Amino acid sequence: MLSMGQRGFWDEQERVAKLQEKKPVLTRLTESIPWESFRPLLDKGYSQERKSNAGRKRIDPLILFKMLVLQQLFNLSDEEVEFQVNDRRSFEEFVGLGVMNDIPDATTVAFFRERLRKAGVIEELFEMFEGYLRDQGLEARGGQIIDATLVPVPKQRNTREENKDIKADRLPDGWEENSNRLQQKDLDARWVKKNGINHYGYKNSICIDAEHGFIRRFVVTPANIHDSQMLPMLLDPENQDNYVWADSAYSGQCFADLLSLGGFESRIHEKGSRNHPLSEAAKERNSVRSAIRACVEHVFGCMTTSMGGKLTRKIGLERNEAWWTLKNLTFNFLRYLQRSTNALTLA
C-alpha cells in the first residue's frame, strides 16, 4: 500500500506521457532526423580490426554519434555528456539506451570523435545531411549570406618568448622533449583585436542560404585570419539565386571582381572612408541589406544562447575544425525542426 506522497507505476506512466506530449526537441530530433542513413559513414569511420571475439562488444556507433550531437546541443565536455546521459532520462532515451544499459564513458566518446576526424568522416556527415535537405526540397535558394564569428578557447599561459615562437610558427625550446606538455599547448589559436577588445581562439566563417537559413558552407580558421580571406571558399555555386550579402569586412574592388567573375551579384555593405563618407542613398541601401543579413546573426545567436555558448576546449586547428563541423551540423538539425514550429525547448 502506498503512503501519502509515494508514486506508483501508473503515476510514473502518466508522468512520462505528459512529458512526451510536450514534444521536447530531443524527441522531435529522434523522430525527424534520418539517423539510420548516417550509419554507413559512422561504421566506416569507427571500423577497427578485432584480434579476437573476446572482450567487450563494440558500442553501436549511432549511440556515440548521438552523444556527439548532445555535446553540441548543450556545449558539453566529454565528461559532462557522460554524466548527463547517466543522469537525465531524456538524454538516455535520445541516444537509444535504457536504465539497464551501460553508458559509454568520456574516454570512449573522445576516442570515437577522434576516429571519425582522422577518417575524414565528420565532413562527410555534414555533406550527407546537406544532400538530404536537397532531397526534401530544401535546396539553397534566395541568395547567400556570409559572416564569421569568433570562437573563444582557454587562454594559454606562455612566456613572451614562447608566444613569439608560436606566432612565427616555431616550436618553443624544450616543448618537443616534453610530450605531455606539448599535448596541452595549442599552437594554432591566435589573438585578434575586434572593437578594441582582444580575443583568443578561432573563427567559424559560414555561408547560409537566405530562404531556408541552413549553413551550406563553412571554414574554421585561427582568429587572426581576416574574414574576407575566406570568401572564395564560402561562396556556394549551388545556390539557385546569385545574390551575396555580407558586411563591410568583405567590401572592396577585388571582392566585387571575384563575385562578378563567379556570376554573383553583390549585396555587400558599402563602406565609407574619412574623405568619402557614404551618401544618403548608400546608407539606405545598407539599411535594406542589413534586414536580410540579420538572418546570419540569428545563427550565431542560436549557438550562443540556445546551444550553450561558443567556448571550445579542443586543442589545435584540426580538432576545432571537427568540433565546429559537428556544431554546424547540429545547428542544421535544429533548423530543420524549426521549419515546422518556432517552439524549440532544449531541456
Which residues does each predicted region cover?
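Charged, often Cys/His-bearing segments associated with DNA-binding zinc-finger transcription factors
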Residues: M1-K44, R339-A347
